[in-house]
Amino acid sequence: MPINIPVHLPAKQILESENIFVMDETRAFKQDIRPLNIVILNLMPKKIQTETQLLRMLGNSPLQVYFTFLIPSTHTPKNTSREHLDEFYTTFESIRHKKFDGMIITGAPIEHLAFEEVSYWKELQEILDWSKTNVTSTLHICWGAQAGLYHHYGIEKIKLAEKKFGVFEHLVKEKKERLVRGFDELYYVPHSRHTDINTEQLKNTPNLKVLSVSEEAGVCLIVSDDDKQVFLTGHPEYDTDTLKQEYERDLLKDDTVKKPVHYFIEDGDALVPVNRWKAHATLLFMNWLNYYVYQETPYVWE
């Protein structure tokens, strides 16, 4: 996919160096095709890193895609410059009248808070309600998945006794679902979270399908019956070294922090991360974009 991004977005140079096809607005304007419009609600603290990770996942399809980056107006990010936010981001008020083919809601490192304690919770609820009528399919990631399941279905999150941290094996349960088309029966996903969803409540909730699970990490992939809501409890978009960065960050605060499991190999005295999830992660995002967005979205929104 020639992903269509602003000329000066920091991710552009990184993705081009990785041989991922990107185009700027000038070239995209000359192509006479109907592009997809995807809005990304970026709740992660490192905005540029998350932008790059998600655009990398969406950069290998023949479709042209426009991206709109969104932040809550009721929260001021502390780890991204005001200049970057002003140039590349907008708020819900400026887009609420629009229709989008797809939406991605990222995770956020705020699991210790009850949903109602989150500063932008009411705004997020409004966005989630809006997505049901203004977006063809919404992909919720990690905390974003927990928030979406709680808001749409009343499924609560529960605190884990120990952080779920590492790269975990998952089993595909619903092999005929389009979202996992082409998957091996077993695949890997990084997880980094202190909470989980209430699986008993999930079992008793109609209109939701569990597509994959892990013996160690629990439920990973959930889809609504109409394919409009996709919930992903892990972080398949993560770079090879993202868990390593989080581990080193946490070690500075607590030297008893356990290292992520099933992730490092030892090379002498060094711990080297190994990426075992990239191929399936790319396929997951491509399947969502093709089958749940492109194949389902109207050519002209009414």
Swiss-Prot record:
Pathway: Amino-acid biosynthesis; L-methionine biosynthesis via de novo pathway; O-acetyl-L-homoserine from L-homoserine: step 1/1. Transfers an acetyl group from acetyl-CoA to L-homoserine, forming acetyl-L-homoserine. This is Homoserine O-acetyltransferase. Its main location: cytoplasm. It is found in: Cytoplasm. It is an enzyme of class 2 (transferase). Its EC number is 2.3.1.31. The gene is metAA. InterPro entries: Class_I_gatase-like, HST_MetA, MetA_family. The record marks S192 as: Important for substrate specificity.
